[in-house]
Amino acid sequence: MNVTHLECSLTGERYEAGKIHNLSRAGKPLLVRYDLEAAAKTLTRDSLAGRQAGMWKWRELLPHDGDPVSLGEAETPIVGLPNVAARDGASSLLVKDEGRLPTGSFKARGLAMAVTMARQFGVDRIAMPTNGNAGAALAAYGARAGI
């Protein structure tokens, strides 16, 4: 793990990594900051070639250092839609097919990471205000983690 600190997305105020936080004192999300030079030492073409595909392949650029909570997240394809592009006067149109993720939504990636971090910090209950894909992803990953 190459996390150096967390940073308020509005003010830039620094927060200690490795602790549970909610929002910043300004009420804004906290961004994870990394030592990219340290990550580059182990994140090489050779090291990536031997890893299983998916988001956890990039572990040096993720804020966890234990076993991930996973439902088998795959690398999802970027698909060209030339007919739609031509119809709409665009030179090209690309879409990312996130429906192939375990819960059918891009929300799976974020919630996989959130539940992984919650488990790492010893959290045993999680709730979030949602009536959509995020709730389904949280339920699935929470169940996998035993939370």
Regions found by a protein language model. Give the residues of each.
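PLP-dependent amino-acid enzyme catalytic core
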Residues: 1-147
